Design a protein with these regions (language model features):
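Extracytoplasmic/periplasmic substrate-binding proteins
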Residues: 4, 11-13, 119-123, 155-187
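Extracytoplasmic/secreted proteins, especially bacterial periplasmic and envelope-associated proteins
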Residues: 9, 73-76, 87, 91-94, ...
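Sec-exported extracytoplasmic/periplasmic mature domains
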Residues: 15-19, 83, 97-104, 130, ...
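Short, solvent-exposed loop/beta-turn-alpha elements that line the ligand-binding surface or hinge
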Residues: 24-38, 112, 130-152
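Extracytoplasmic/periplasmic solute-binding protein
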Residues: 47-64, 69, 93-142
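Aromatic-glycine-rich donor-binding/catalytic loop that engages nucleotide-sugar donors
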Residues: 75-86, 163
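Glycine-centered hinge/linker elements that transmit conformational signals in sensory
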Residues: 96-98, 138-171
């Protein structure tokens, strides 16, 4: 293919395999506008360090899908109870508990089906200082997923599921989450 659209999480795989070419080989004067969000440098690949690197990498793609995580909540319900949007995971548990009345309503719907759980767990992991790789910016792709920070993040993820989530979170994907929100069964 001459042009593909892919999500940022697949960029490293394609870039490292040599499936992308440097845009500047086609147009040496092309520069990505500074107003375009770079999603952690995913437009630039450094073949030497095998990492994203806007400073020393080759320009391989225009970022259009950063898979930004968003916490949805029902503003009408929050206003009715005088709640503020949560700033911490514990705030989220406290707020969600106000609405949790299964099966009529769930305080939190987590997408935890196979595949979707990787998207949902990311914000927990990063908020606890966790990571998958040790130092990818400097080419160290040692796996550090089994770290203390990631363990704490997983414990919080499971705490939210167990206290205010759906008992079958493992079967909920994007479509199911949307239906819970649209039908008023999620706060």
């Amino acid at each position: 293919y001459d042009i593909v659209i892919t999500s940022t999480e697949f960029m490293a795989t394609y870039a490292n395999s040599g499936e992308f070419i440097n845009f500047n080989d086609i147009d040496p004067d092309f520069k990505l506008d500074s107003g375009i969000c770079g999603y952690q440098d995913t437009s630039y690949w450094n073949y030497e360090t095998r990492s994203f690197d806007a400073k020393n990498g080759e320009f391989i793609g225009i970022p259009v899908n950063g898979n930004v995580q968003v916490l949805y909540y029902r503003r009408d319900l929050y206003e009715e109870k005088g709640l503020q949007p949560p700033k911490t995971w514990d705030d989220l548990i406290k707020n969600a508990a106000e609405f949790h009345n299964p099966p009529r309503m769930y305080g939190m719907i987590q997408r935890s089906e196979r595949g979707a759980v990787t998207y949902n767990f990311g914000p927990y992991m990063f908020s606890y200082g966790g990571a998958v790789y040790k130092d990818p910016q400097n080419g160290d792709f040692s796996i550090v997923f089994n770290s203390e920070n990631n363990r704490k993040a997983l414990e919080k993820y499971l705490e939210i599921r167990d206290k205010v989530g759906h008992p079958n979170a493992h079967s909920i994907g994007q479509g199911e989450m949307i239906q819970y929100l649209r039908t008023g069964k999620a706060a």
